[in-house]
Amino acid sequence: MYLRSRAIVIKNMDYRESDKLVTIFCEHEGKMKAVARGIKKPRSSLRACVQPFCHSSLFFSRGKGMNLITQGKLLDFYGNTREDFERSLYALYLMELLDKSLMEGVAIPRLYTSTLEVLSHLNHSGYNPMLIRYFEMNLLVNLGYSPLLDHCVLCGKKDDLKVFSLPDGGMLCRDCSYQASGAVSLSKETLALISLLGRSRLATVERVRVSNKAQKELEYFLEKYLEYYLERKFNLKKAMSILKRSMPRY
């Protein structure tokens, strides 16, 4: 059986002497793994098509065993991102999020499209913290983990909302907050940003001005929310934190 699909390359790893095992996020087939044979050979025509976070059109041979990539055409290499260490690190973080959160064989077309959108903006416009926060929230929404912000998830009250409960996935009112575990306090600005991320287009999100305090609070909240519901730790978050601390301030 033969298959052709547009795909975002999540990662690749050594597989036998001259092959690589490639993990990809396909437009209609979802996440899958396939072998790229002879990819380590200097003249391999597939080499550029299966690099992490590139966008390619791939041809597969599917059988009872492992899927094989037989041909490929590079659609976008995101060269500006690859030439910039910081941007590359963030692009790889997006791929780590996909790899650790997606089940194989489950198509999520909207997430596929938004991933391409974020990679394109990162490549052409440079790094913007809200770009990454947009992707994190978009991932959660597409996986069915949208945070509930407009009412208390325990009693339904819509006013006097006090804290966000990670185990309950939403806000708690003052009365219910006393029995909460894993609660996170969020400012009004941060709550507004979370709501904006969940319902707005990327172009709108990128134009929003955010205070440093709310930016840090938003990043912390989404990090803990992702870790709680995806039950994963994301290694590149630590690397990015180290990078931020080491960068000069002017």
Curated annotation (Swiss-Prot):
Keywords for this entry?
Answer: DNA damage, DNA recombination, DNA repair
- Does DNA repair show up as a keyword for this record? yes
Please indicate if the UniProt record lists DNA damage as a keyword: yes
Provide the transmembrane region boundaries: none
Q: GO CC terms for this protein? A: bacterial nucleoid
HAMAP family linked to this entry: RecO
Protein's name in the database? DNA repair protein RecO
- Organism field: Syntrophomonas wolfei subsp. wolfei (strain DSM 2245B / Goettingen)
Task: List the top taxonomic levels of the source.
Answer: Bacteria, Bacillati, Bacillota, Clostridia, Eubacteriales
